[in-house]
């Protein structure tokens, strides 16, 4: 797709990003809850989730240790990604990892390599910041995202399990 551009997010993008994030969360939750109703209680959002995401994204746009990217088609936002550098558990030799926290492309534009474009820019930024390893979390039931990340070379590292007490 020749008309795709990837750019760093700006503070003026925040309201638009909240809209993309809301669409992302609704679709994400529809996928994971439909396949596993036990997850429902774990993905219910607080009433002020939009405001929290706005503030979190704003802090990441301003941070030298984070990268927020916007994917545009003919100048219209169609997706975004967010990544940041996080400290690893102190006992391990790898001090820091790059964490890909969000990746969303509008459904109409999926399957066209746009997420790979976002990933490539994100990984280049991580390498520039001397980060040797990237990590991502994915719900077991989100098979599309799981397969994308596997195709990008991610491997299974840890499994988080939960139980109601």
Per-segment meaning from a language model:
Residues 116, 140-158:
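Conserved active-site alpha-helix within GNAT-family acetyltransferase domains
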Residues 48-69, 99:
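A short helix-loop-beta-strand connector motif used in the catalytic cores of GNAT acetyltransferases and
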Residues 126-137:
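Conserved GNAT acetyl-CoA-binding A-motif
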């Amino acid at each position: 797709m020749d008309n795709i551009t990837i750019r760093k997010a700006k503070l003026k993008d925040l309201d638009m990003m909240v809209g993309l994030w809301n669409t992302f969360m609704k679709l994400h939750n529809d996928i994971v809850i439909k396949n596993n109703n036990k997850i429902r209680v774990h993905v219910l959002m607080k009433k002020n989730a939009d405001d929290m995401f706005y503030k979190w994204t704003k802090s990441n746009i301003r941070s030298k240790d984070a990268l927020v990217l916007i994917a545009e088609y003919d100048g219209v936002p169609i997706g975004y990604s967010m990544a940041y550098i996080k400290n690893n558990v102190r006992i391990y030799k790898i001090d820091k990892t790059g964490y890909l926290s969000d990746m969303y492309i509008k459904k109409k534009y999926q399957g066209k390599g746009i997420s790979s474009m976002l990933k490539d820019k994100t990984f280049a930024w991580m390498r520039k910041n001397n980060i040797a390893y990237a990590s991502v979390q994915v719900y077991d039931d989100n098979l599309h995202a799981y397969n994308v990340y596997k195709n990008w070379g991610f491997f299974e590292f840890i499994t988080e399990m939960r139980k109601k007490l």
